[in-house]
Every structure is written in C-alpha cells, then in structure tokens.
C-alpha cells in the first residue's frame, strides 16, 4: 500500500470525534494528521484540549496527543493539511451545512457524521452494505459545487441501523408496513453516566428529531438516483412508524420491530436471508467491514447489549426473537452499536468505500 491518506477530524474533541480518533489508530489506509475544533480548543495540544473529557474505553492514542488543534472555522488552513476530512462538528444545522460545503469547495472531500446534509438532494447518505451505488450522485453534486475532487457524503442516523439492514435483507418478501420502538443508549447524546447522572435508573420517552429521522431516512437509503433531476429520490415504501426512547445504557441501540409483508415468508427464509446478506464492503474486504454483517441468535434472551453490542467490533448487526405476530406477520429484536456502526465506524467504512471507488484520492 502506498503512503497513507492524511485525514482531518472536524470536531475532534467531542464524543464522536474521539471515537473517530480511536478507530483510526493503526488504520491501514488513513492517518489522522490534523484535528480541528472550536476556537476555544484551537492552539492547544489535543491532550490539553480534551483534558479529562476523554470518553473512550481505550486510552487516547499516543500519536494524536501532541497534535496542535486547529480552528475548524479556518477552512483553507485546515484543508491545506489533509487529503479529506471526517466531520463531527457540534454547531447548528445551518452552520454545519455551510462549513461542510466550504470544505468541499476547497477540493477536500467531507465524510460527515452529522445530519445537516442528509436531505440535500445530491448528497449520498450511505450504509455501504445497502446502497453503495448512491455514491454516483457525487458527480452531480460536484457540478453544483463547481469542484473536481470536493464533495460531501454522509451516513444515516444511528437509530435505523438496528432495523434498516434487516429489512433490506428481506426486500424480496416486500415489507410494506413497519412499526418499531427503539431503545437508545446515552452515548447517542454524546454523554456518559458521569455527565448525565439523571439517566441512572431512568427512561426518557423522547429524543428530539429522532422519530422523524427513524421513519424517513431508510426510505432515502432505499431510493434511487434520478439522472434528470440529478438527485436521489426516496423510495415510497415501506411505511415506517417509530417511537424513540432514551434508556440507561451506555452503548447500543435496541429496536423492537413488527413487519407486514406482501409475500409472507417462512421463519427459515427470513433467517437464511439475514445470514446470507452481505454487500460491497465484504466483497472488497474493506478494512473496517464486518465479515458477517448480520448475525441471527437463536436464544430467547438475545441479542443483549452486554453480550452482543461489540459483535464484529461493533460493526455487525445482531437479530433475535423472530416470531410470528398476532397483528403483523413477523416481529423481531435488533441491536447495533450506536457510536461504532451507527456513527464513526459507519463513516470510516463509507470513507473506505469512497477510496475503493476512486472518489477519495491523495491531493
């Protein structure tokens, strides 16, 4: 492998930024050379800027401790140092939209963990195992931005990872109505129990904006590129209704899901479809790709966070409790790691796919 690509992390001091830095330690293709954050962190070493707010289980990588944090708003300066950036900035949606496009216009590809551009019509929102072909919309985005290399690509919300891959694996049976409730970990809010003591022994039945994302984002992932409109057009079905609940768990989003199918399958057909489902990342053997994307667990008391959340290093999806339902056809429970597959890990896999497809190259 030739020289590694130089990576910048925008918003490197927050929880998702820290997860990017942890995941990219010893990455075979990418090397974190630049970290940018808010003006108050700029000028300090990364170690100083984070201080006692390091939230990962593993220690801070030695290689990043002495990196001097740059001001994320000094776009030209940061862009000059890197081949591409991961974005985990904490700003308003409008500010994020603007700054990510500014980076793209410096001919620096942006792979974002933020929601700001998820509905920008020519921005691909990708789960690499599900819709890698959506990256082809980048050529239309580059036309609009007037760039040759620069673009923005995003990954979808963490909440949908526990059921959207499962429904994709069952596409041939035509699911048309889906009811789900997600039970979401506190790290999804960038918090630990130390930061958020009121979550201990508590449940909060509301997460702002999350239900709409959980209902609509899968349809965009299942959509197609309209070459006349130069954009991604979402799919019309299945209809999804969702409730999102914050639960006292550190990592891992669980979903209880009920599904109606146009062609009602057998249990064996459903399980076989899950176990056999894989995608382009597995074919290409991308560094962060799980060998097994979805596992089905036979035991009645699985999937469990404590046993299953780190399946395939947090990049795999665990499914269990598949059984016939009295109102719907089938029901199941899904589990995914919200800050690995659901956030930074999913974005790293997107970047690996973009490199393999030739969209991200050395400057």
Positions of predicted regions on the chain:
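N-terminal Rossmann-like NAD(P) cofactor-binding subdomain of oxidoreductases
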Residues: 2-205, 239, 311, 317-318, ...
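Charged docking surfaces used in two-component/phosphorelay signaling
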Residues: 187-363
